[in-house]
Amino acid sequence: MDKPDYAYDTFLRHFNSSGLNDKDNGFTMLELGPGDSIASGVIAHCFGAKKSYLVDKGSDAIASSQNYGLLFDYLNKKFECVDFPKSSDIVKPVEEITDKWNIEYMVDGLDSLKKLEDSSVDYLWSQSVLEHIRKPEFT
């Protein structure tokens, strides 16, 4: 994740259209097709997400937490009360990040969606992914 401002702006654009700005008790977010990053789950945490699902067709997300240092530094400057480490202090495996902020990275494509309980997601979004799903895969 070498462009934290792009990740943030993309998340914010979708979030602002979701109607969840005033949700007091947190929300559950799902991004379909996060690509090579868990950034949207990290950013959702800043906006009060209690759970984030990141669903993709394969395990393409960068596995080293050190690669998220730029994102953490960006968010630490943007928000006053976030609990992110400084990029120079990051030595954790990415699983510690996903566990700490309740981010579930699911890599079985549409089969991952079938594992979710009905009505368990408040906010679902996708950035340039839906056009890659073939119609027969929806059935």
Question: At which residue positions do the language-model features occur?
Answer:
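Active-site and donor-binding regions of nucleotide-sugar-utilizing enzymes
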Residues: 10, 27, 38-42
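Class I SAM-dependent methyltransferase Rossmann-like catalytic core
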Residues: 1-25
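Conserved acidic residues
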Residues: 27, 50, 122
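A short beta-strand submotif of the Rossmann-like class I SAM-dependent methyltransferase core
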Residues: 103, 126-129
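Conserved class I S-adenosyl-L-methionine
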Residues: 24-36, 53-56
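A short acidic, Gly/Pro-enriched loop at the edge of an enzyme's catalytic core
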Residues: 111-124
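A short, conserved alpha-helix within the catalytic core of class I
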Residues: 133-139
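Class I SAM-dependent methyltransferase SAM/SAH-binding core
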Residues: 39-113
